[in-house]
Amino acid sequence: MLKVEERYTNAVPELQKAFKYENIMQVPKLVKVVINTGVGEAVSNSKALETAEADIVAIAGQHPVITRAKRSVANFKLRAGMPIGLKVTLRGQRMYDFLNKLFFITLPRVRDFQGVSNTAFDEHGNYTLGFKDHSVFPEIDFNKIEKPRGLEVCIVTTANTPEEGKKLLELLGMPFSKD
């Protein structure tokens, strides 16, 4: 099975032909992968943030940055500056390792998996994928998680349109649904 980096080198001529790029630098490429999770219960339980951080470190192989509330919301007992989530940005080799794991190990483990949505692209060709439960990742021991936690994976590309981004991710091995 080819890795994502190897698939990209094979995909460049195909993308160049499909979108009629004159210069090889016009071909879209991967920039970064951002993994984000909200830990709303961290407002009342500081241990929740620590366990979520340990899970993100296991999944991404890199320590996350704590995201903080921008403004106070009285109904949620939230004050500006309180920790409410975690995010980690993967670039370079860690990004490719994570995408290999995501495309070929994690997504096939999702129950009743029929492929990822074709419509989760923004207007610039970036793709966002949400997980309701982080236990589908192989590094997470299902017996040790306190609470299933959702997370979001955003794949950022240099594509200009959603069609370019979809073709790039398709050639890299992302399993899209057949609808």
Curated annotation (Swiss-Prot):
Keywords, comma-separated and alphabetical: Ribonucleoprotein, Ribosomal protein, RNA-binding, rRNA-binding, tRNA-binding
Highest rank taxon of the organism: Bacteria
One protein family per Pfam: Ribosomal_L5
Family per record: Belongs to the universal ribosomal protein uL5 family.
Lineage of origin: Bacteria, Bacillati, Chloroflexota, Dehalococcoidia, Dehalococcoidales
Name of the featured protein: Large ribosomal subunit protein uL5
MF-aspect GO terms: rRNA binding; structural constituent of ribosome; tRNA binding
Matches recorded under InterPro entries: Ribosomal_uL5, Ribosomal_uL5_bac-type, Ribosomal_uL5_C, Ribosomal_uL5_CS, Ribosomal_uL5_dom_sf, Ribosomal_uL5_N
Subunit structure: Part of the 50S ribosomal subunit; part of the 5S rRNA/L5/L18/L25 subcomplex. Contacts the 5S rRNA and the P site tRNA. Forms a bridge to the 30S subunit in the 70S ribosome.
Reported function: This is one of the proteins that bind and probably mediate the attachment of the 5S RNA into the large ribosomal subunit, where it forms part of the central protuberance. In the 70S ribosome it contacts protein S13 of the 30S subunit (bridge B1b), connecting the 2 subunits; this bridge is implicated in subunit movement. Contacts the P site tRNA; the 5S rRNA and some of its associated proteins might help stabilize positioning of ribosome-bound tRNAs.
CC per GO annotation: ribonucleoprotein complex; ribosome
PROSITE patterns recorded: RIBOSOMAL_L5
UniProt-listed GO biological process terms: translation
Organism of provenance: Dehalococcoides mccartyi (strain ATCC BAA-2266 / KCTC 15142 / 195) (Dehalococcoides ethenogenes (strain 195))
